[in-house]
Every structure is written in structure tokens, then in C-alpha cells.
């Protein structure tokens, strides 16, 4: 007697629902994640026990490299009051105007320079070299930052501000114009990120310049 052959049924797994869930999860993470911004130099901070979170808006971050070079990063408001790009543009124009008022070697910005600065996450070159830096391709700009830094020294005479103090005042004025300077007035809108190997004396100079 011959064996009865049982017809094998084709197994089919419907992945439609799983695909939908995957898309939803990817969308969620894209909308809620905070992407790490590229910094001009690597700054390895020392361990901290502070439970205070660094604000993610209306913030001026001061990066202090191990060799003492200083850079700035700016974040605007979360809403459309003063976006980060608009804040950078306003700060650049104000800083250059303040610099030109006390220096004979004037800096002349073009629309191209302003647009390039709007897209720059971090910056830190002498103002006199700003246009030259902004004229560089992005990858060359990144390399140039590593050997530059914002000029800063101990100074308590605000009638003759350091370039770092010019930038700080420009940031405050730009936020004040937008009605968003409260955090900076209270000090919560300023963050200093220094490398674990940065001499404390250098960090103290930065704090004294604020």
C-alpha cells in the first residue's frame, strides 16, 4: 500500500506590522534624539557629581581645550523666537561692529561670510582673521580651528575688552534684543566645558572674563 503524501503548506510570515513598528520607532528616535555636535577640539571633562542638566537652548558654551585655547558654541531658543542660526548671525554682526569701533584694521563681512557663520556650530579665531576663515572650505575651517582659538587674557578694564569679552557682550546683546537674555543674566545660560587636563588658572581667566 502506497504512502499517502501530505501536501506541504507554504509558510508565509507577514512582516508588514513589524515594518510599520520599525518605521515608527525610527521616526520617534529621529525626532527625540539630540545629535552630538562636532566640536573643534576634543575636550575630555573630569568626572562630575552635579545633578544639574546643561540647558539645550539659549546657551553660550565655552570650550577650553587642554592647551588653553578657547572656543564658543551658541544655541538659540527652542521656538522660532531666535533660532541658533539667527543668533549666530546677530552675534557675528555685533561682535565685528564692536571690534571695528576700536581697531584700525576693519573687518568687512559679506553675505557669504554671514551665511557660512550661521552654519558653523563652533567658532574660535581672532576677529581679524574671521573673513579669511569663513572663506575656507568647511574641512579646512575645522583644521584651522585646532590651531586658533579666541584671544583672551586676564582683563578687568571693560573699556578695553578682550576679544573673548567682545563675543560675550555680543551674545548678551543679541539675546537681549530678542527678549531671551534672562538665563544669561542669571548665569544658567553659560556653560564652561574644560578638559580634565586644562590648567585651573586658564579656566579662572575665562571665568574672570565673563
Predicted regions and their residues:
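Short N-terminal signal/transit or membrane-insertion segments
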Residues: 1-9, 61-63, 108
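Long, low-hydrophobicity, acidic/polar, solvent-exposed interaction domains
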Residues: 36-210
